Amino acid sequence: MNVHFKNINPVDSSVLKKRPVRILVFKTNLRFKKDIRHIEPLLDQHPGIMCWNVDRYDIDNVLRIETMHIQPKEIIRLVTKAGYFCEELPD
């Protein structure tokens, strides 16, 4: 498994008590390192993304995002605007 971890930001524990961390999971076509490098600045600079990673060797090229307040539609818009496929995977 080849997983890329990015944008790991520490979170104040008092914030977690008010709002739990949500894990959003998406099917993508982020297959190559160049694809990840292309979206890296977009995801790293997004203030609502605590942590993200891509499993390029999963059949669905899974993008996993940890957040407290971002809606899946926002991630889909961000990734598709960069020219990639992105679809939320069901729980």
Language-model features: locations:
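Helix N-cap motif at beta-to-alpha junctions
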Residues: 67-72
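Short amphipathic alpha-helices in soluble, non-transmembrane regions
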Residues: 38-43, 74-83
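Conserved short beta-strand edge segments in small beta-sheet-based binding/regulatory domains
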Residues: 17, 52-54, 83-91
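Short glycine-/aliphatic-rich beta-strand segments at the starts of folded cytosolic domains
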Residues: 13-31
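Short amphipathic alpha-helix segments
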Residues: 29-47
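Surface-exposed aromatic
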Residues: 58-65
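Conserved phosphate-binding loops in N-terminal lobes of ATP-dependent enzymes
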Residues: 2-4
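Short amphipathic beta-strand starts and helix->beta connectors
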Residues: 6-12, 44-51
